[in-house]
């Protein structure tokens, strides 16, 4: 199972230009609101028509502007689940799921498939309920069942947990993970939640301003996001523009720190460090900083450190016990070279 996408769509003030490929895996499109993630899924599903390009799923050409191919949404067999699930409000659970099985001409096979998927998702006892009578989790399971009963070529999940309360998300995330495993084909997951993406996806495409900003396995993207946007979306809150001093040293201008770094790639414009990667310490890579604030989190402290009066404060996260024992007005910290993220403004070429 695979997907290939290379499309462009001009919306006037916004231009979508997406190019990526994925195999039999879960690929997450990680980006901020309005970055083009959901629009990409709509183009794949046939709801929005690109201006140019090509979309292929499992060697079936869904769209090709040069060859004038543009299959209907029904012909594409893409299983798109919207953020709000888009259940028919005046139809029961059973009727909603039957609507998804409409392509099967044999009535007995169609009813057997509906019964099987309802049993699989624990919906049999809710067959006569309307969507308004269901919990958020039951609505999600109904939407997934309606999609899967149609035997789609690919599963497209658009912010599948955004409509759920926090206390429901983790449990339902486990159910979706199992659904993905059972599906066994290509899955595209749209999200702005880095933790959700890391738990569910195999690979990550960072999306910014309608285009791919970074691409790789989830480990690659989190350990080396490569761009400012990639670093921010994967949770790095300490980012500073730099001045390159020599082959192994840069000046973090916002932080007023000279940092030792690994080999510096071309076009690097900024440096970042995750809050939990800062270390207490002494020596040539240490900086004496003034504590200018502390934030108590449920299970940790974030301490704001300033290397000079004019510098931007850097956030350092540590467990509560450490800070309660070592709380002080000034402290020496290290920025380990191996923990520093060397960042470009954007990627000139995205790996596919």
Regions found by a protein language model. Name each.
Residues 222-247, 272:
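C-terminal boundary and immediately downstream tail of ABC-type ATPase nucleotide-binding domains
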Residues 38-41, 141-142:
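ABC ATPase nucleotide-binding domain helices that frame the ATP-binding cleft
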Residues 77-79, 83, 90-229:
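ABC ATPase nucleotide-binding domains
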Residues 42-43, 203:
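The short alpha-helix immediately C-terminal to the Walker A/P-loop
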Residues 4-26, 30-32, 38-39, 46-49, ...:
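Non-catalytic connector elements of ABC transporters
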């Amino acid at each position: 199972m695979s997907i290939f996408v290379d499309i462009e769509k001009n919306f006037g003030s916004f231009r979508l230009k997406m190019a990526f490929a994925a195999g039999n895996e879960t690929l997450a499109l990680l980006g901020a609101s309005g970055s083009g993630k959901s629009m990409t899924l709509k183009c794949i599903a046939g709801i929005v028509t690109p201006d140019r390009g090509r979309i292929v799923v499992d060697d079936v050409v869904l769209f090709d502007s040069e060859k004038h191919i543009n299959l209907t949404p029904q012909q594409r067999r893409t299983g798109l689940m919207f953020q709000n699930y888009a259940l028919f409000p005046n139809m029961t659970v059973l009727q909603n799921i039957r609507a998804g099985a409409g392509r099967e001409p044999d009535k007995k096979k169609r009813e057997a498939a509906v019964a099987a998927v309802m049993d699989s998702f624990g919906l049999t006892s809710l067959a006569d309920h309307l969507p308004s009578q269901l919990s958020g989790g039951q609505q999600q399971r109904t939407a997934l069942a309606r999609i899967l009963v149609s035997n789609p070529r690919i599963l497209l999940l658009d912010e599948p947990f955004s409509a759920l309360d926090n206390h429901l998300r983790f449990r339902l995330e486990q159910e979706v993970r199992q659904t993905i495993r059972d599906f066994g084909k290509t899955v595209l997951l749209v999200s702005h939640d880095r933790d959700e993406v890391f738990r569910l996806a195999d690979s990550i495409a960072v999306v910014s301003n309608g285009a791919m900003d970074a691409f790789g396995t989830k480990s690659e993207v989190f350990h080396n996001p490569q761009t400012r946007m990639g670093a921010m979306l994967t949770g790095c809150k300490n980012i500073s523009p730099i001045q390159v001093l020599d082959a192994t040293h840069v000046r973090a201008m916002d932080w007023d720190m000279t940092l030792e770094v690994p080999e510096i790639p071309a076009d690097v414009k900024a440096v970042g460090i995750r809050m939990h990667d800062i270390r207490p310490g002494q020596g040539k890579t240490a900086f004496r900083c003034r504590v200018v604030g502390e934030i108590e989190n449920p299970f940790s402290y974030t301490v704001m450190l300033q290397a000079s009066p004019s510098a931007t404060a850097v956030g350092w996260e540590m467990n509560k016990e450490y800070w309660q024992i070592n709380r002080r007005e000034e402290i020496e910290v290290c920025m380990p070279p191996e923990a520093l993220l060397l960042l470009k403004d954007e990627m000139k070429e995205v790996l596919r």
